[in-house]
Amino acid sequence: MSKRLESKYKINRRLGVNLWGRAKSPVNKREYGPGQHGQRRKQKPSDFSVQLMAKQKLKGYYGNISEKQFRKYYDEAVRRKGDTSENLIDLLERRLDAVVYRLKFAMTPFAARQFVSHGHITVNGRKVNIPSYIVRDEDVIEVREKSKHLAIVLDAAQSGERDVPEYMEVDHRQMKGRFLRAPKLSDVPYPVQMEPNLVIEFYSR
């Protein structure tokens, strides 16, 4: 298991937020970060630290994306027409592992990434094992036939912790979903407040 995947248990504590809204999150047990033995006196954060925190939250939410890859999403968001913040969210939500997570084929973004990497997902009938693959409008995402009865898939589909967002549709009996349209920030069911505008400010310094 990669260092990036191992860090998932520390992300919530380090950031001090329950990124995925899960009941078992370590942040529900203590509010201070890993390696700390109590709360430190809070100081007013600088603009830089606020922007950095916004970036770390967004990166962490999508499975702790590498800095190099996350910067590429920012560059592409700037290149596209329209609101850069909305463009960034759209790109992140179109990642195949993010779509698999949203469709409730996996319990966490980390599990979704592994599920895609291990070849359990098809897009428009073709196997795709690249988690960062960008899904387009009307693409059909399906769990491969041999994988539809795996416990991890069934457990995720039956979980009541999350709902499938309106910009996607899913049939859990067939384990098949469709990406319908570009999401707006207000459409995305983040359990915590995300501030992509601060991420844009961080990179445009």
From Swiss-Prot:
Gene Ontology molecular functions: rRNA binding; structural constituent of ribosome
Pfam families linked? Ribosomal_S4 (PF00163), S4 (PF01479)
**Single GO cellular component term:** small ribosomal subunit
**Disordered: where is this region?**
26-47
Its job: One of the primary rRNA binding proteins, it binds directly to 16S rRNA where it nucleates assembly of the body of the 30S subunit.
Q: What is annotated about its quaternary structure and interactions?
A: Part of the 30S ribosomal subunit. Contacts protein S5. The interaction surface between S4 and S5 is involved in control of translational fidelity.
Tell me which PANTHER family the record gives: 30S 40S RIBOSOMAL PROTEIN, SMALL RIBOSOMAL SUBUNIT PROTEIN US4M
The identity of this protein, by name, is Small ribosomal subunit protein uS4
Give the organism, scientific name: Gluconacetobacter diazotrophicus (strain ATCC 49037 / DSM 5601 / CCUG 37298 / CIP 103539 / LMG 7603 / PAl5)
**Encoding gene, per UniProt annotation:** rpsD
